[in-house]
A protein has these predicted regions:
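Positively charged n-region of N-terminal signal peptides that target proteins for export
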Residues: 3-11
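A general, composition-driven signal for non-globular sequence regions
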Residues: 3-4, 21, 133, 189
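Hydrophobic h-region of N-terminal signal peptides that target proteins for export
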Residues: 12, 16-25
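Active-site-proximal alpha-helix that buttresses catalytic centers in soluble enzyme cores
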Residues: 27-196
């Protein structure tokens, strides 16, 4: 379990760092923010080990930005609200940042593929773009073949025992982007990685 948690942590951190190119052009004197969007999790332990770590490490990696987080899933936000935990939607987070005087926003989602959640994040940013000087939205982790190559390198850095297999599970959808998971599997097999 600890090894899986470590792999997941590195996985999400890598997702975040792959979006770094978006943020390199920000002007330091301007009030800018980084909005990390997560699908969300209603499990406190999962949040603490993954999503909270990504948000915290984003703030450490980019101290020049105010870092905020938002949860994409309305179902997760409703469940959390019943427990007294309140998370903003991407739209709400953007509106709050605007009200606080932020004019440049960089949005990076922790979603894996260009699925319905990522489409939702892009739509929210587009809807509010006229109210900001600039909103840039980063791509999901598995956006290009090059991204998949980098992720394969990270996921396979520690090889399983010969009689062990590692299974990665991604949440698909009805969009063609679900084929990204099949592409990742094919690429792993092409690299001779039979235990993944």
């Amino acid at each position: 379990l600890l090894e899986t948690t470590t792999i997941m942590r590195h996985f999400f951190i890598t997702l975040y760092l792959l979006g770094i190119s978006l943020f390199s052009s920000a002007q330091q004197e301007e009030k800018a923010a980084l909005l990390i969007t997560h699908y969300g999790s209603s499990d406190p332990q999962t949040r603490a080990l993954t999503l909270d770590v990504v948000t915290r490490e984003a703030q450490e990696a980019f101290p020049q930005f105010t870092v905020r987080e938002a949860y994409i899933s309305p179902i997760v936000r409703k469940r959390l609200a019943k427990e007294g935990v309140y998370k903003d939607s991407p739209t709400d987070a953007l509106l709050k940042l605007r009200a606080e005087g932020y004019r440049t926003i960089y949005v990076q989602s922790t979603t894996l593929i260009e699925g319905s959640e990522m489409t939702s994040v892009r739509r929210d940013a587009d809807k509010l773009r006229p109210f900001f000087k600039e909103i840039k939205v980063g791509n999901p982790l598995l956006y290009s073949v090059e991204d998949c190559e980098k992720v394969i390198g990270i996921l396979t850095a520690e090889q399983p025992e010969k009689k062990e297999d590692i299974v990665y599970v991604g949440h698909g959808n009805q969009l063609p982007s679900t084929a990204t998971y099949a592409m990742l599997d094919f690429m792993m097999k092409a690299h001779g990685l039979k235990n993944f």
